[in-house]
Amino acid sequence: MKKLILAITASLCIATLISSCNNLGINAPKMDSDEATQLIVETLEKNINFDEWKIYEIRWMEADELENNLTVLFVEMVNKAGDCFSQTFTLSGPGKGNISDLDEAGGLRGKLDFEKVKGLTPASINVEAIRKQYEEAKAMIPENYTFKSIGDYLIQETVPSGNEFLDRNKTFGEVKAEFSMNITENGKEIVESAGKKSVQYYEVTFNVLPDGSVQMEELSLIHI
């Protein structure tokens, strides 16, 4: 996920040379706010023709790490011809309002059967439920650690990858969600190595369970 954020952030900065990358948070709703989640719903409603497209992946994220500013919405979807594409929407910062061209979806997946994809819609995003998930995850933060940001939120329908081995044991049509949360250890946010200082934080991944509760899955130490 960190590599994806860096790639998208770089493209945003290149596309807006007159502005500083440090201004990506201009007018940005906070990732953990109802406003941010509702903006995702409204962006999908406004920009996607659900008669012609079925979305199988929705991801929204911050760009500047630890700032907690909603910046980008990324979708992957299939058209009636079975061709898969991705598209990026810039929701805040200097590139606010930019919509990327359709890009062919990468990976092994080349085509999908449009009729067999159920499709994610704005109704797949429940603002109240997601707020409760964030609250539950924050309650799991250990003592002496501080919440900094929601890194990203992903909703994904399980679709064929194009590789039988990778697709074994998958339940096609199943919808899963997960999100990452960034936290810092109090008093240990800045570390120094070889005379260079860097920010140290932990990226914690949470899976959303079928009953709507969350489960901590993975913790990664990151330096920036």
Positions of PLM-derived features:
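Bacterial signal peptide processing site
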Residues: N22-L24
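Positively charged n-region of N-terminal signal peptides that target proteins for export
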Residues: M1-L4
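C-terminal motif of bacterial Sec signal peptides marking the signal peptidase cleavage site
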Residues: L17-S20
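Conserved small/polar residues in nucleotide/adenosyl-binding loops
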Residues: I222-I224
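Long, charged/polar, surface-exposed segments that mediate recognition or autoinhibition
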Residues: L102-Y153
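Exposed beta-strand-loop-beta-strand "reactive/processing" segments of non-cytosolic proteins
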Residues: E52-T88, V159-Q200, V204-T205
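Short glycine-rich, low-complexity/disordered patches
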Residues: A28-K30, D34, Q38, E42-N68, ...
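Contiguous hydrophobic, core-forming segments of folded domains
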Residues: V75-K111
